[in-house]
């Protein structure tokens, strides 16, 4: 939660950052990308400032791995939607996964930050926090049903994920919620006929994969998901 001085960067700090990225549900290749970028910045600073190299990235994962399957079929999506779940946390995690899928793979951060004002004239209109691109999605009853089940905690946000009046910062709330949801989704993976572990990112990748199987042009899928061109 604070800035880290160059002299404080060691294997312990880098290891803690790597663990944080893993708990965020990022893939190994994405973690490697972040680590390599951070290492390049560190090496540049060491060279320009002529300071000792403490080699903080000696134990960090900086390789690339073969990408594993990260999408589930429409059949599996239906199985997940039809599950009779016992606990609130299970229902909440499942429904947010489905909400992401219904909204063309919306990221968890964007879902959490949605406000009631984002729904206008039958459309969900929002800007991706990652790219700033504005997206418009037709508002469906399936989305409204989920919103109705998890009402706003503060009267401002669309879903009951973040609370402006809580003691913890919105960033802390997002991190806690995302970790809990991904942990719960991992357990739900065993209840349906799939061979991968569910995360919020799987919802995003599943929408893109299933759209592609319906012969939706890749360019349209990319635009729909808010990718930078």
List where the protein language model places each region.
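Conserved tyrosine-mediated DNA breakage-rejoining catalytic core shared by Y-recombinases
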Residues: 12, 59, 113-149
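A short, basic/aromatic helix-end/turn motif that makes direct DNA contacts
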Residues: 113-118, 222-228
């Amino acid at each position: 939660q604070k800035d880290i001085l160059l002299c404080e960067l060691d294997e312990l700090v880098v290891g803690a950052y790597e663990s944080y990225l893993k708990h965020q549900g990022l893939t190994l290749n994405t973690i490697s990308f972040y680590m390599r970028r951070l290492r390049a910045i560190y090496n540049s600073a060491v060279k320009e400032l002529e300071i000792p190299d403490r080699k903080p990235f000696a134990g960090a994962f900086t390789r690339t791995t073969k990408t594993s399957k990260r999408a589930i079929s429409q059949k599996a999506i239906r199985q997940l939607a039809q599950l009779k779940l016992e606990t609130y946390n299970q229902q909440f995690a499942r429904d947010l996964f489905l909400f992401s899928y219904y909204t063309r793979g919306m990221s968890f951060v964007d879902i959490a930050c949605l406000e009631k004002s984002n729904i206008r004239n039958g459309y969900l209109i929002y800007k991706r926090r990652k790219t700033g691109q504005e997206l418009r999605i037709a508002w469906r009853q399936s989305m409204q049903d989920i919103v109705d089940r998890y009402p706003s905690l503060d009267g401002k946000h669309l879903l009951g994920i973040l609370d402006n009046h809580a003691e913890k910062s919105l960033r802390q709330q997002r991190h806690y919620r995302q970790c809990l949801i991904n942990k719960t989704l991992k357990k739900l993976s065993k209840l349906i006929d799939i061979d991968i572990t569910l995360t919020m990112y799987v919802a995003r990748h599943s929408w893109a994969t299933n759209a592609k199987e319906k012969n939706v042009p890749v360019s349209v899928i990319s635009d729909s998901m808010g990718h930078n061109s």
